[in-house]
Amino acid sequence: VDRFHSISEATNGLGNTKLLNEALYDYVTIGNNEGITLAKEHLNRLYDDAGFEVLVANLFEKEGVRPEWAKPYKLHTTTDGITIAFIGLTVAYPEFYHMLDWHIEDPLIHLESILEEVRDEAHITVVLSHLGKSMDEYMAEHYDIDVILGAHTHHLFERGVLMNNTLLCCCEKWGRYVGHVQLTVDKETKRLLKKDGRAIKTERLGAYSKPLSTIEMLQEESKHIMAEPVVHLKESLPVDWFHETPFSHMLANALKTWCGAEIGMVNAGVLLEGLEEGVVTRGDIHRICPHPINPCALKVSGKTLREVILKARRPNMENLEVKGFGFRGKVMGKMIYAGVEVIPDTIPGNKLLLEDVLINGESLELDRIYTVGTIDMFTFGYLYPELSTLSDKQYYMPELLRDVLTDMLITHTSSVKL
């Protein structure tokens, strides 16, 4: 349920469930898109009409009970009497799940207990893993599992990889491949004799080019939902990924206000397009800001903030084509601030060195702690390691950046709420 897609956004994932029903799935597990980009009430309703079972062993209500729609595993017996244990595990992001009123636990603890539980009943064990390639390899090395159907890191095994007698399979992303696993079992002894898996390009399948009536129906339904008018702009709001515009500055200021911060900070590349004068709909806002990215407030030392400001000014950072972290745009673009004035050094030819940084009109103090309203993707991975290691972070969930954008447009002096 990637809310980048208008059907997922408009239906809160219910359209995705309809498509899974049509594809005749028996078992699924959830990933972080379902778990931490949907509000709890939407996740609790996501599978109301599912024609399949949802397996996720390590997700709980805060009280410690599993949600009604989830089971840890399923023992599936074929017509030949072969019992297969299907186990569902999802990646744990405790801080994010906690913000959404869930409790997520270490998937391996539950894997161990389930393997012990099904040992005497199951002839074959299959893990539906939304844990990523490295964790799948770890499970293969350390546990007695026959097949791991992988996800999360969007890797591709065109042929299944056998590791420590565990078959690792994964089909990348976006439905570009469909997986086929073949298991050969001795009917008498119920022993697994052979296993093989491959990923097949969906464009090679006969039905690939045929329009699916369910998708067409969902597209029409979503188009109607997303046509809801939000504001009427009295003037256009253009964007430029490499220069500050009133629109991008407004967004930085909106993050500052939303997070109750001293400073707002956001990259211009999060706004994929500008907005024209006139009526702006939900669909327009989703189109220009489709990212499943959350606002967050950070406590940052002046020293670290200065380092981030310097790094953000580098051409290689502004031109960086970002993949992942919730970002669905093209490039990072220029870093835009509210409450920050960057004064470059006057050395001839200088583009990077700074004479001073003013925070709300006063020189930045290296030892002072500042509150920064920004976006969660800066706290992940390699973009800004200085921010990813901060201990004092507050994420705002389930609100997404486009919710901040919507509020900003409604209160914009050159707009009228509809």
Where are these regions (language model features)?
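Residues that mark the start of a beta-strand
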Residues: 82-83, 262, 371
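Feature captures C-terminal
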Residues: 276-418
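Structural signal for hydrophobic packing residues in well-ordered secondary-structure cores
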Residues: 47, 91, 112-115, 119-122, ...
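Short, glycine-/Ser/Thr-/acidic-enriched flexible segments
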Residues: 2, 91-92, 132-133, 173-175, ...
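Acidic/histidine-rich
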Residues: 137-141, 147, 244-283, 334-355
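A short C-terminal boundary segment appended to hydrolase-like catalytic domains
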Residues: 186-280, 412-418
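Pocket-edge structural micro-motifs
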Residues: 56, 88, 170, 265-267, ...
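Acidic, metal/ion-coordinating pockets
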Residues: 1-201, 242-250, 254, 395
